Amino acid sequence: MTRIEWRYLAFDALSAAELYAVLQLRSEVFVVEQACIFQDMDGADAQALHLVGTLQGVLVAYARCFAAGEKFSEASIGRIVTRSCVRGSGAGHALVEKAISCLFQQWGTQAIRMGAQAQLASFYGQHGFEKSGLPYMEDGILHIEMLRSV
């Protein structure tokens, strides 16, 4: 597989086409594929640093990165998503590692918290995240908070 190109962009730095591609991918996976009706555009995108991964000009991986205090008291990663065509290729692992690096580069080495789909806890565990708290339902999908300590 050709190498994914990674970029970190503030909300205002996203072009209209890039923002459309991000929202389309998030909707494709979180709303359609997972059959989950929820308000994806939650008002938090403007505060996020957006990690976009493209393959031959097509958005295939994406995550939102937040400074401590924006979503949780710790820095956080959310809306972690890969296009189906790159799943199983290691793109998801690369995405999580890039998101962690992004947070550290922007705001220094620190703990990172996320609200993960419970079924993906072992995946995130491979990147140093540990379950933190009890599982909870969010938009009809079981989630659990996970913390990656320093």
Report residues per predicted region.
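Conserved GNAT acetyl-CoA-binding A-motif
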Residues: 96, 103-116
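Short amphipathic alpha-helix that is part of the acyltransferase structural core
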Residues: 1-50, 54-58
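Conserved beta-strand in the GNAT
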Residues: 52, 58-68, 74-76, 81
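A short beta-turn/loop motif at secondary-structure boundaries
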Residues: 41-46, 69, 137-138
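Conserved acetyl-CoA-binding loop-helix of GNAT-fold acetyltransferases
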Residues: 82, 88-101
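Short beta-strand micro-motifs in enzyme catalytic cores
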Residues: 47-51, 73-75, 142-146
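A conserved beta-turn-beta hairpin within the catalytic core of GNAT-like acetyltransferases
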Residues: 68-77, 87, 106-110, 140-142
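Conserved catalytic-core motifs of GNAT/GCN5-like acyltransferases
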Residues: 113-115, 125, 130-145
